[in-house]
C-alpha cells in the first residue's frame, strides 16, 4: 500500500519515461523562500532587446547564542547577515516591486536560484547568483497601509 502511494506521488514528478537514459526527462525543483529586509530601493534596468527587470538587495540574518545550554542571558548573541540579489522579471510583479519595495521593508520572497556570468566595467568576467522572484509578500505595516 505504501509502495503504491509512493509510486503515485513520484509519477507526478516524471513527465516522460523511457528506457534510453539519454532521453529521460524528469521534473526537478529549484525553489527558494527568504524572509528579511530590503537593503536598497529597487532599480529597473533594461538591456536592449530584452524585457526590463527590477533589481534590489535583501538581507537575511542568522542568530545564535555562543553559550548554548547556559541560563538565558548568559551567552553572547552572534549574528551573521547574508545579502541576496533579487531580480523580478514578471511584468505585473516587476512593476509592483519597483513601486512599493523600499529600503528597510520587511518582505517574504519566493522564487528560484539562478547562476550567471557578466563582464564588469574593467572587462573582468564575474559570477553572479540571483533569486528570480515569483512572488513577494509585503510584511511591513507601513507598506500594507499604502
UniProtKB/Swiss-Prot annotation:
It comes from Danio rerio (Zebrafish). Residues 29-140 form the SSB domain. It is found in: Mitochondrion; Mitochondrion matrix, Mitochondrion nucleoid. Signal peptide: none annotated. One of its GO terms (molecular function) is enzyme activator activity. GO terms for biological process: DNA replication; mitochondrial genome maintenance; positive regulation of mitochondrial DNA replication. Changing residue 140 to N: Reduction in retinal atoh7 expression. Its main location: mitochondrion. Disruption phenotype: Morpholino-induced knockdown results in reduction in optic nerve size and mitochondrial depletion. Strongly reduced expression of the developmental regulator genes isl1 and atoh7 in retinal ganglion cell (RGC) precursors. Nonphotoreceptor cells, both in the ganglion cell layer and in the inner nuclear layer, display compromised neuronal specification, whereas cell numbers in both layers are unaltered. This is Single-stranded DNA-binding protein, mitochondrial. It comes from the Eukaryota. Residues 1-16 form a transit peptide. Keywords: DNA replication, DNA-binding, Mitochondrion, Mitochondrion nucleoid, Transit peptide. Changing residue 37 to Q: Reduction in retinal atoh7 expression. GO terms for cellular component: mitochondrial nucleoid. Binds preferentially and cooperatively to pyrimidine rich single-stranded DNA (ss-DNA). May be required to maintain the copy number of mitochondrial DNA (mtDNA) and play a crucial role during mtDNA replication. Required for retinal ganglion cell differentiation and retinal integrity.
